[in-house]
Amino acid sequence: MYRLIQNGQLLIDDQLVKRDIAIDEKGRITAIEAQITPTDEPTETIFDAQGALVSAGLIDGHVHFRDPGFTDKETLQTGSQAAAHGGYTSVIAMPNLNPVPDNLSDFKTLVARNQTETSVHTYQFAPITGDLVNNDLVDMPAFKAAGAAGFTNDGHGVQDAQTMYLAMQQAAAIDAPIVAHVEDISLVNGGVIHDGAAAKRLNVPGIPSVSESAQVARDIELARATGVHYHICHISTKETVALVRRAKADGVNITCEVTPHHLLLDDRSIISDDTMLKMNPPLRTLADRQSLWAGLMDGTIDVIATDHAPHTAAEKSQSLLQAPFGIVGSETAFSLLYTHLVVNGPFSLAQLLAKMTTVPAQVFNLPAAGQLRVGDQADIAVFNLTQPTTIQATDFQSKGHNTPFIGETVLGGTELTLVAGQVAYQRSK
């Protein structure tokens, strides 16, 4: 446990300013000052940040820890260690597990395991319906009382409008968000990548943009009618951005997220049968990606979430038609985004950090997270903004190495992550 972080750079009023941070034995921040003189207490341990960025720990509203049911892909331990490696101190896990925690007993067990078996604060979404695919709603008030951060069938869109309408009514009544994977399965037609030039060239079925935007349009009207907080997962199309922008202007209680891979890649990258580029929703067109950047800049898109989705090497070694959707992202998100959006792009560091700290804390109602404040628990990430590093699978804490970004050189690697003052990750020297 570190009791003092010295020589850090905090972002204050869009400027990096030298600050020291003192932490007490309970893991709470006791002082943030230009200079804090170390005491002579033998329990005090000092971390010299050496001019690195010291930030509030990042918040990821969309991770898949695969535990229980798919522990060959990930476990609570490895998934949370991967999050800590990426500078995340709070995450919200998806319920597409085996068994699906759609009964109160299983859900309570999972919440308890999240609290005792993970390296970071791990919150849990509950399913909207039984088994994620039927039309029987879970007991939302009971699940919220048991700790549900919201309700989602992630991995599946809610296909029946009446089911979604009733779910939104119940969620609105208990002030809980509906977190939607938006996908009209009747329009997907077995697609594996975006329905565009790459799909035609590779002769594989494509997923049309309207499979996303059609369900978004439906759900916006249901959200308007019910007043629920409606949050859209991993948006990918320019049509969705336009729909969300219009809905926000109309006063609909709507938020949304975008992933790093949808910001950084498009379907021009798919030149072969490369399953590291297979995810759901798929990589769309350059025009879609440009719209995502614009939406992130103007506030239409609220937060960045990784959709960290580990799979085994054997699964991802199959063809595009057979391999599962998804890539890992927890360990690379900040460094990739800092390098491409800030250093080589139009975003400021303040804008990037807001989308990964303060705004997700607001969107997901985590008032103790997302800021560095005296009296709060010391959830802290330290990033080296000047030293280039190469993304290597051998450095990953996750069981999953399925990412197209292996080998890329980035800035912004994680030096240290503290969760409630305890070391969750520290880079080896």
From Swiss-Prot:
Binding-site residues, substrate: H64, F65, R66, N96, N280, H311, F325, G326
GO biological process: 'de novo' UMP biosynthetic process; purine nucleobase catabolic process
SUPFAM superfamilies per record: Composite domain of metallo-dependent hydrolases (SSF51338), Metallo-dependent hydrolases (SSF51556)
Annotated positions binding Zn(2+) 1: H62, H64, D154, D307
Record Gene3D superfamilies: Metal-dependent hydrolases, Urease, subunit C, domain 1
Keywords: Hydrolase, Metal-binding, Pyrimidine biosynthesis, Zinc
GO molecular function list: allantoinase activity; dihydroorotase activity; zinc ion binding
Cross-referenced InterPro entries: Amidohydro-rel, DHOase, DHOase/Allantoinase_Hydrolase, Dihydroorotase_CS, Metal-dep_hydrolase_composite, Metal_Hydrolase
Cofactor note: Binds 2 Zn(2+) ions per subunit.
Pfam families: Amidohydro_1 (PF01979)
Reactions it catalyzes: (S)-dihydroorotate + H2O = N-carbamoyl-L-aspartate + H(+)
Domain of life: Bacteria
Enzyme class: hydrolase
Binding-site positions, Zn(2+) 2: D154, H181, H234
Keyword Metal-binding attached: yes
Cofactor names: Zn(2+)
Active-site residues, Swiss-Prot/TrEMBL: D307
EC number: 3.5.2.3
Family: Belongs to the metallo-dependent hydrolases superfamily. DHOase family. Class I DHOase subfamily.
Protein known as: Dihydroorotase
Organism: Latilactobacillus sakei subsp. sakei (strain 23K)
